Amino acid sequence: MKYLNKKEEEKAIIQILEVLLDNSVPFSGAHRKKQWEKGWGENLESGNITPKYFGKYPVQRFNGRLVKGCNEKQMLYSIVDSLAKKYLKQADIYEFGCGTGHNLWRVKAINKKAKLHGFDWTKSSQKIVNSMGFDGQNFDFFNPADIKLEKNAGVYTVASLEQTGTNYRKFVSYLLKNKPEVVVHIEPIPELLDSSKLLDYLSIQYMSKRKYLSGYLTYLEELEKKGKIKIIEARRSGIGSFLIDGYSIIIWKPIWKKQNN
């Protein structure tokens, strides 16, 4: 791994700015379901479960700096592995927005006894996940199905809840109803970045342009004040892709309240 020199960094920042000024860049939301179906369908057809967005750029982010010579996928897996070891020890573990299921393999390697469930809104994803021997089911963040989670389950998302933008409350309500033991997020969280720093500012602007998660941590903090959840961790991972510092970490759990007789 090497930090970019001044000339390389200036060139990279210009490239980021060009993306931010490009009006053809698509934004997230329910309208993009067909594109995700097509993308995961290509992975299904090829038999390769690595998402195509990995390796798109030779430059990544590390501790607030631009670097080269790193493998973004392996950097992300280091986060998934460490969080799985610490938090995902349950008998049933659910990934929401699992895509090709590549993160399910990582979690299964850590918790070999767990039953893994991969939920996604595309049929191609469910075919991939079921072919891997996991439980693949249809689930839409925007309109959560009434699928009951197993008791004391572990839940996680990796760069998938980002697609909901500001429409995440239905999903949170679904989780509060099902009361998993823990919820692990690896997602772009603008509240955790420092807008007074150039690369963070550009990352926040990219999140806004793509209409990624906005106000999610703030919403969770409001729920915590109301006594509905407990936030265990909320921090940056120090790892990101070229355009975005998108692998921040939030860990929370619902608070169980006994009913008065």
Identify what each model region corresponds to.
Residues M1-V80, D200, S208-K211, E222, ...:
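N-terminal accessory regions of S-adenosyl-L-methionine
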Residues S82-L88:
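Glycine-rich helix-loop-beta junction characteristic of Rossmann-like nucleotide cofactor-binding loops
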Residues Q90-G99:
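Conserved class I S-adenosyl-L-methionine
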Residues T100-N143:
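Class I SAM-dependent methyltransferase SAM/SAH-binding core
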Residues P144-L149:
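Short conserved loop adjoining the S-adenosyl-L-methionine
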Residues A153-N167:
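A short SAM/SAH-binding and catalytic strip from SAM-dependent methyltransferases
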Residues K170-E181:
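A short glycine-rich, Lys/Arg-flanked "PGG" loop and its adjoining helix->strand segment in the class I
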Residues P180-L192:
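Conserved beta-strand signature within the Rossmann-like core of class I S-adenosyl-L-methionine
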